[in-house]
């Protein structure tokens, strides 16, 4: 008599593997979301640092040329390279990754998840405020 061997996985084994994959995915997805948020915050911090540097360089140039410390109205105008997504002054944030300078006092950014943040900017003192969701 010939023995027939069935090779492969049983239905129970396949279900157990699917459950384990589901558990791993449930743990990994929230951590991945936190990583994306952290990356966007780091990118925003980099842009703000570049803006602060551009504002200070402008102020130092003003001291040298005019003997008075003045700050630019729009800090984006004096950056070496504007950030990707900068759409100009007083534009509507309607695209992911977009930056704008609003009403002469706010720097605004829309993240890829459509959340929006802004920082105050005082052109009299060159000071930037903290990140605020809006």
In which residue ranges do the predicted regions lie?
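N-terminal single-pass transmembrane signal-anchor helix
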Residues: 3-35
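Extracellular/periplasmic head regions of type IV pilus-like filament subunits
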Residues: 60-117
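Short helix-capping and hinge/turn segments at secondary-structure transitions, especially at repeat
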Residues: 29, 34-37, 56, 60, ...
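Conserved interaction-surface patches within small, structured recognition/assembly domains
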Residues: 34-39, 70-72
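Membrane-proximal N-terminal amphipathic helix
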Residues: 39-65
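Low-complexity, S/T/G/P-rich flexible repeat/linker segments used as non-globular hinges
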Residues: 116-134
């Amino acid at each position: 008599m010939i023995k027939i061997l069935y090779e492969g996985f049983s239905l129970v084994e396949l279900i157990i593997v699917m459950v384990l994959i589901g558990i791993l995915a449930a743990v990994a997805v929230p951590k991945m979301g936190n990583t994306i948020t952290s990356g966007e915050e780091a990118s925003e911090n980099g842009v703000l640092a570049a803006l602060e540097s551009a504002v200070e360089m402008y102020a130092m140039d003003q001291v040298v040329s005019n003997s008075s410390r003045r700050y630019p109205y729009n800090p984006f105008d004096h950056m070496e390279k504007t950030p990707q997504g900068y759409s100009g002054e007083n534009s509507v944030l309607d695209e992911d990754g977009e930056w704008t300078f609003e009403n002469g006092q706010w720097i605004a950014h829309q993240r890829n998840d459509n959340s929006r943040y802004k920082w105050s900017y005082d052109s009299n003192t060159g000071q930037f405020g903290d990140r605020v969701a809006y």
